Amino acid sequence: MSQFSFTKMHGLGNSYIYVNMFEEHIPEEELALVAEKVSNRNTGIGADGMILICPSEVAPVKMRMFNNDGSEGKSCGNGLRCVAKYAYEHKLVEETIFTIETLAGIVTAEVTVENDIVTLVKIDMGAPRLTRAELPMLGEGETPFIREDFLFHNQRYAFTAVSMGNPHAVIFVDDVEKAPLTTLGPVLENHEMFPERVNVEFIEILNETEMNFRVWERGSGVTQACGTGACASVVAAILNGKMERGKEITVHLAGGDLMITWTEEGTVMMKGPAEVICHGVYEYKIEA
C-alpha cells in the first residue's frame, strides 16, 4: 500500500487534489492511474483532477495537471491560482510576485496577502494562440478560426477556437442555461478536427463588460469553473467584436466570478480567488 499527503483546494468550485512533490513521491508510471483513482467521487477523495506542485529548474515551482480521466493537461487557470496560494503560504516562495512553470510555458503570479493568507491571485496567462497549429487543430492557415459553423442535431453552432496553453472552442448563445452543454460538449471535445481534444465553452454576453459562462472540460466533463476557458472566452468575444480589448471583463462562472483582461500589450490577465478545502493522507494500491 502506498500513500501521500495532499491538500484539496478549489478555484470557484473547480477542485483538484494538490500534492507537494517537494516532499512527496509518486512514481511517474503511476501518475495517470493515481490521478484517476484519487479524483473518483465514489471511491477516492473526489475532484476534477490532481495537480502536482513540483521543483523546477526555470521557476520557483512547476505545476503538472492531470484530469480526472488520468490525461495530463498543459495548463489550468484555476489550478495556477491555487498553486500560487499554496506556494506562498507553504513558503516555497518568499516574494508576492513569482513565476510558475507549466507544460504550456512560464506564467507570472501575483498574490494579495492579508495576515499571511493569500486572499486573491492574479495570473499573467500570456498571449492567446490563435492559429490551427498552435491550438492544435487540423487544417492549414495562419488566420484566427473565428465563428466557424458546426452542425449538430440539424442546428448550426458557430465556434471560435482559442488556445491559452490548452485548446478551447467558444460558442456564443442567447442563454447558457439552455445550451447543449452535456450533448454538444462531448461531441465537439472528441471531434477529429482536434487531435488533442478540446474544451468547450458556451457564452452569453450580458453587456460590454460581463458574460455568463458554462464549460465542458476536456477529460473532466462539466465543471464549476475553468480559468483558461474564461480567458479564451474573453479573447473570443473581442475577436468577434462583442467586447473591447483592454477592458476588465467579469466572467460569471457557475462557481463564481473571474476578472479577465486582454491587454493592449497582448497578454491575458486573470484575477480571482483560491481556497483550501481540506488536508489529508491518501492511501492507494496499484493492482499488478
Swiss-Prot record:
Keywords tagged on the record: Amino-acid biosynthesis, Cytoplasm, Isomerase, Lysine biosynthesis
Biochemical pathway: Amino-acid biosynthesis; L-lysine biosynthesis via DAP pathway; DL-2,6-diaminopimelate from LL-2,6-diaminopimelate: step 1/1
Chief location of this protein within or outside the cell: cytoplasm
Catalysed reaction equations from the record: (2S,6S)-2,6-diaminopimelate = meso-2,6-diaminopimelate
Enzyme Commission number, as recorded: 5.1.1.7
Top-rank taxon, per record: Bacteria
Any one GO molecular-function label of the UniProt entry: diaminopimelate epimerase activity
A GO biological-process term: lysine biosynthetic process via diaminopimelate
Disulfide pairings: none
Quaternary state and interactors: Homodimer.
General function of this protein: Catalyzes the stereoinversion of LL-2,6-diaminopimelate (L,L-DAP) to meso-diaminopimelate (meso-DAP), a precursor of L-lysine and an essential component of the bacterial peptidoglycan.
PANTHER family named in the record: DIAMINOPIMELATE EPIMERASE (PTHR31689:SF0), DIAMINOPIMELATE EPIMERASE, CHLOROPLASTIC (PTHR31689)
Entry protein name: Diaminopimelate epimerase
Gene: dapF
